[in-house]
Structures are given as structure tokens and as C-alpha cells.
Amino acid sequence: CNGDGINNADMILTLNYFGIDTSYTRKFEQEIRAAHPDSVIIKDATHSLLSDDVYDDTYDYVFASIRKWSGLSGGVILKSSPDIEPLTRLNMDYEKTVHEAMSAKKEYIRDGKGSKERFLSLYNKAEEMLDSDPAGYGISKNAKEQFRYFDLDRVAGSRKSNCQILADNQDIWRMKGIEPVCADLSEGDIPLFFPVIFRSKDHRDKGVGKEGAEGAGQALP
């Protein structure tokens, strides 16, 4: 596909899933730009945030949520022309719920206190708050300060190496009825997820566990 099927579009939104095959996605987006020079192209770079060449001149706006990469309560990296003023209003109910979930998860993992159900329930409650409220909110002071010390290179290296371990053991996955979507990683790709296809729901539940993946058919690196 080269974008020829897009007609009279004032605005085009593109995104790459999982952070894999990003070079193919970029080629597709460049073809769209060539075919639609006057359209506004917005790129959601959340999944490909740490991959190569995410922020070039093909796009008018690029945004990427840092929540999925960092575990912080909020925050977005934005490249735009002209500049967009950052939002300052905070959703305090959301911030409170996320921090309760973080504390409950930490106590469960570190001290064995509480339950997995409690912190998962709190995280789900926080996500529902965002889904039900389309208004935009700014990053909290605490999250902004923490992100200043967030080691992007370390995270990128860990994601890449962990995903490669999963890819290198694909024969074991197939024995369990799980087919990796990407058998090989491109040089510039830093994956957010390691996507897989399950032969059946039973294979998913037995191979990963009902709560072992963030979503059906996905396993985290």
C-alpha cells in the first residue's frame, strides 16, 4: 500500500504497532507524504518511541506517550510545527489512583502484602478514568521530575535484548501453540511488545496465563 487509496484527506494519522518493522512503516509514511503533500500527517510514535528515525520531517506532528515505557503516571513527548503550548491542568483523581496502584504493586512484589487483584483493579480504574474523559491533561510535577532521570538507553537495551531472547527461542513457543509474529528484529527496532499469535484461547491461558499478558496475543519484553 502506498497511500493511493486515501482521497481528499485533510489529516492523516499513522502509527506503528509493537515497535517492530519500523523501517517499513516509515517507507509507507513517506509514500503517503509524497502522494498527499498538502495533508497534515500526525504520527503516534508511542510503540516506536525508542526506534531509529522516528522524528523526521515527514510528519507535521509526532507524539508519543511515555506511560507504557516508563511506568510513570503520565506525560507525552511532542514534536510539532508550530509549537503547541503544554497543558497544565491535572486530573488529580487519576493521579491519586495511579499512585495507589503503584504502591499496592510494590508492596505485593517486594513484601508479599496485599494481592495482585487489588493493584490490577486500581490500574484498570485509572485507565477507565482516561477512557471516559476525552479532555487533555498535563504531566504531574512528580512524573516530570522522575522522567528527567529516566535512562532511555538502558531501557532501549533491555527491551532489545529481552525481545531477542524471546525471538531466539521461537521453537519452544511453537511447541506450546504460540507463533511469534516477528522471528527477526531489524537493526533499528526497539520493541515495546513481543507480539505473538495463539493457536487457541486454551493455548493462551496455558502458555501465558490469563493475566500473564497485558492483552490477548501480546507478551511484554
Language-model features: locations:
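PLP-dependent aminotransferase class I/II
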Residues: 13, 88-221
